[in-house]
Amino acid sequence: MPQLDTTPWFITILSMIITLFILFQSNMSKYLYPLEPQPKTLKTQLYNAPWETKWTKIYLPHSLHLH
């Protein structure tokens, strides 16, 4: 059974990594980034849940127990 020749693997893998790095860098250089990023002000909104606006049975006085 013949042996697998792995001699060109190193240069193939190395050239693939270098090519991917160059492609990635060229794609990232197309984007414009702000020089001094400013923090974004977030508006906090208050949401009223239905159980906060109406009375429920746990807030009512205890009812009389009928025996």
UniProtKB/Swiss-Prot annotation:
GO BP of this protein: proton motive force-driven ATP synthesis
Transmembrane keyword on record: yes
Protein's membrane topology: Single-pass membrane protein
InterPro entries: ATP8_mammal, ATP8_metazoa
Key words of the record: Acetylation, ATP synthesis, CF(0), Hydrogen ion transport, Ion transport, Membrane, Mitochondrion, Transmembrane, Transmembrane helix, Transport
Main localization of the protein described in the UniProt heading: mitochondrion
A Gene Ontology molecular function term of the record: proton transmembrane transporter activity
Entry keyword annotation includes Iron: no
Pfam entry (one): ATP-synt_8
Modification sites for N6-acetyllysine: K54, K57
Family: Belongs to the ATPase protein 8 family.
Subunit (UniProt): Component of the ATP synthase complex composed at least of ATP5F1A/subunit alpha, ATP5F1B/subunit beta, ATP5MC1/subunit c (homooctomer), MT-ATP6/subunit a, MT-ATP8/subunit 8, ATP5ME/subunit e, ATP5MF/subunit f, ATP5MG/subunit g, ATP5MK/subunit k, ATP5MJ/subunit j, ATP5F1C/subunit gamma, ATP5F1D/subunit delta, ATP5F1E/subunit epsilon, ATP5PF/subunit F6, ATP5PB/subunit b, ATP5PD/subunit d, ATP5PO/subunit OSCP.
Name listed for the protein in its UniProt record: ATP synthase F(0) complex subunit 8
Chain's gene name: MT-ATP8
